[in-house]
Amino acid sequence: MFVSVQASQVSVACFVALLLVAAASDVVSYRIPNAVVLAILLLYPVYVVVTPADVDWPWALAVFAAAIVIGMGLSAAGIFGAGDAKLLAAVLLWAGPELAPLTLIICLIIGGVISAIMMTRVRFVLAGAFSSLGSQTLSNALLAKNMPYGVAITAGGFFVAWALMTSV
């Protein structure tokens, strides 16, 4: 078995890069590509194999399974997007049982902040500012009715990545 702090950190950095792609896609098109979520899922076993940290992967799989079942239920009820549910489950796989509760709290707080912005006049001010800076994509995202919750999930994923990087 190949164990390396550097390889572990590279796998976590790839996780972060994939989260950024998911968030950007969610902001631009309100879609999180299945290929990105699949890449995040397939990268996890690589991390488990190369990290010198002790990973409780069976319980991480249990957290993932619970998250995907609950998330798909919420998606079927029209409460949560399917892409968001899949991305959250993938992030919680990486989080495992130890980091999952705090990761969910971070996602909820950031999601709440985004919701507050989307429900107030602040979004129009921010949209105008982004438009004047030449970022029409961000401006349009702020003026849309949908909320890119993948951004909040990505913030939770950043916490997971930070925790994993600092634990080895």
Predicted feature residues:
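A membrane-topology feature that recognizes alpha-helical transmembrane segments
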Residues: 1-168
